[in-house]
Amino acid sequence: TFKVTLNTPTGQSVIDVEDDEYILDAAEEAGLSLPYSCRAGACSSCAGKVTAGEVDQSDESFLDDDQMDEGYVLTCIAYPTSDLTIDTHQEEALI
């Protein structure tokens, strides 16, 4: 289990996420309302930016290598591989 800190427009939340659980799903289970659309890694609605830690988002098909290198993540298909911090609601930054 990893500690995932989510920095949202309304404040900060820390949730526990299993290494085989998508970050978006865990956030919803914790009662948080994060943006999403396709839930398949094919759009940018759920995009966040990792500011600390690592994720596995090998199922994504939307972000390019430069965006991933900059830390962008699709929370609907991202698994934590360490404790991490994500700034949520980053779709506008990608467009």
From Swiss-Prot:
Cofactor: [2Fe-2S] cluster
Compartments in which it is found: Plastid, Chloroplast
One Pfam family named in its UniProt record: Fer2
Domain of life: Eukaryota
InterPro entries: 2Fe-2S_ferredoxin-like_sf (IPR036010), 2Fe-2S_ferredoxin-type (IPR001041), 2Fe2S_fd_BS (IPR006058), Beta-grasp_dom_sf (IPR012675), Fd_pln (IPR010241)
Binding positions ([2Fe-2S] cluster): 38, 43, 46, 76
Domain 2Fe-2S ferredoxin-type: 2-92
Cytoplasm in keyword set: no
Zinc-finger found in the keyword field: no
Cofactor, free-text remark: Binds 1 [2Fe-2S] cluster.
Cellular component, GO, one term: chloroplast
Keywords: 2Fe-2S, Chloroplast, Electron transport, Iron, Iron-sulfur, Metal-binding, Plastid, Transport
Molecular-function annotations in GO: 2 iron, 2 sulfur cluster binding; electron transfer activity; metal ion binding
PROSITE patterns listed in its UniProt record: 2FE2S_FER_1 (PS00197), 2FE2S_FER_2 (PS51085)
Example GO BP: electron transport chain
Family stated for the protein in its record: Belongs to the 2Fe2S plant-type ferredoxin family.
Role of this protein: Ferredoxins are iron-sulfur proteins that transfer electrons in a wide variety of metabolic reactions.
Protein name as it appears in the record: Ferredoxin
Source organism of this protein record: Marchantia polymorpha
